[in-house]
Amino acid sequence: MKKILLFLFIFLSTFATAQEHKKVLCPTPPMGWNSWNCFNKNISEEQIREIANLMVSTGLKDAGYTYLNVDDCWQTHRESCVIQSDSVKFPSGIKALADYVHSKGLKFGIYSCAGSKTCAGRPGSRGYEYIDAVTYAEWGVDFLKYDWCHNNGANAREAYFTMCDALKSTGRPIVLSICEWGTNRPWEWGKGI
């Protein structure tokens, strides 16, 4: 009887620990707002702050729309390998903007690409995944829309798993949104991310 109890104790302890490590960041589709369809390339810190205010004042936040995502064209170049935001469009910087969004009880999202460039031709994350992930974590990013432009024939599954591993390595919970267009059957491998 003691052996059975010991076995059950070890099994249940191991199972509980394994379940803890499989914690899902976003068990349902995230609800929120993305800047691309509204502003395209013409985004600014002022607009994003205004959208954050509106998400709260109009009741969207209370209805579950908690993610505010800044899409492509927030970035301009890399400095010592670190992605830099457009200081004209975002004079306070991305960290300050994320802090503002968080102060409204919302989650802050940002955009990048698995290719060498984003869809709009800005610097992508290819080859900089771990550096970008650390930068995003330092800024307080909660969500990453990860696009598939300028990928030079890369393996989609490997590219998305690389960014997933990079985000996990930061210790900050950042939801990874696979924006791969469906050409590489992400429904077969995306759940593992």
Regions found by a protein language model. Name each.
Residues 157-174:
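Short acidic, glycine/proline-enriched helix-loop-strand junctions
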